[in-house]
Amino acid sequence: MTMHIRWRGMELPSSLEVDRDSLTQTYGKFSAEPFERGFGASIGNSMRRVLLSSLVGSAVTQIKIRGAQHEFTTIPGVLEDVTDIVLNVKSLIVNSNTDSTRVITVERNTAGVVTGADVQTDADVEIINKDHVICTLTDDVPFMMEMVVETGRGYVPSTEHSSVDHEIGIIPIDAVFSPIVRVRYEVEATRVGQKTNYDRLNLEIWTDGTINPEMALTEAAKILRKHLNPFVQYRELGPSIFSAARGGAGSPEAQLEAKLNMTLADLRLSVRANNCLESENIMTVRDLVQRTEDSLLEVRNFGDTTLNEVREKLSQYGLHLGMRVPNQPLF
């Protein structure tokens, strides 16, 4: 039996249903109910727009091919011209676990099809569609290409990657950073008691494989919530009520609470650090500072480099790991 929540006379959904039978790394179907009439479309449309435009992803932004001065040329021994190679590289699905720019390469000397599996990457970069064709060598000729991988949001045209004084031979390309391929939502009627004028929201998400649909949905909801926070009055009323008992909004207690209530996004950590912490359900600075260094090092993919990054970020706010603080906000 579904549990319902009422708030100020309005029906609210209590949980999100996930279709586990169809859930994969690239597809997910989610449902939530009941919404008051009209809220299903409002939430569904907002989530769809955020999913398609605002999630962070990785893409190749520039390439450099040995022997090619610009994209309107051909390379001896290569079936495709450079323009076709650029189009193929645009469809290469790249997953980067770092915010910094990375350079990946392709080197081949024998005839045959060059695919994503031939790309040489480092530990922070992964090629998802390894069977994707980049080009075809018709002869045993040396082929060398460098690709610049960056992180970003949405679609960024090649003109924003290029500069007047860029090195000859560097070819900027359009970058599709969004890891979301498609989003579809529908609203249908649902029942609460004897009333049937409520909404049920069904949301389907297709990704490129660099992020799973559940994580994508969570990230989109966080982004939407962060943009709505300034409109929520209790964010301003809370510190005033707290300061009346503690001696002012500028008191040390109030300042500490403000820092502890920050989210991980406020710390501007790297993608790797964020993913590691969120996998442990660490969502706020309050959650983070209560963890010890040893416990964090036990988290998968959380190494000394990431630990030093977290230490440095916390120290900027006068905080450190292993602190003893209240588990719940004081206001």
UniProtKB/Swiss-Prot annotation:
Protein family per UniProt: Belongs to the RNA polymerase alpha chain family.
> Among the entry's GO cellular component annotations, what is one?
DNA-directed RNA polymerase complex
Cited Pfam families: RNA_pol_A_bac, RNA_pol_A_CTD, RNA_pol_L
UniProt gene name: rpoA
Matching entries from NCBIfam families are given as: PRK05182.1-2, PRK05182.2-5, rpoA
Q: Which domain of life is it from?
A: Bacteria
MF terms in GO: DNA binding; DNA-directed RNA polymerase activity; protein dimerization activity
Keywords on record:
DNA-directed RNA polymerase, Nucleotidyltransferase, Transcription, Transferase
Q: What is this protein called?
A: DNA-directed RNA polymerase subunit alpha
Q: What does this protein do?
A: DNA-dependent RNA polymerase catalyzes the transcription of DNA into RNA using the four ribonucleoside triphosphates as substrates.
Q: Annotated region Alpha C-terminal domain (alpha-CTD): where?
A: 255-331
Any one biological process term the GO annotation gives: DNA-templated transcription
How the protein assembles, per its UniProt entry? Homodimer. The RNAP catalytic core consists of 2 alpha, 1 beta, 1 beta' and 1 omega subunit. When a sigma factor is associated with the core the holoenzyme is formed, which can initiate transcription.
Q: Where in this protein does the record put region Alpha N-terminal domain (alpha-NTD)?
A: 1-235
Keyword Transmembrane helix included in the entry's annotation? no
Which reactions are catalysed by this chain? RNA(n) + a ribonucleoside 5'-triphosphate = RNA(n+1) + diphosphate
Q: Which EC numbers characterise this protein's activity in its record? A: 2.7.7.6
* Keyword Thylakoid in record: no
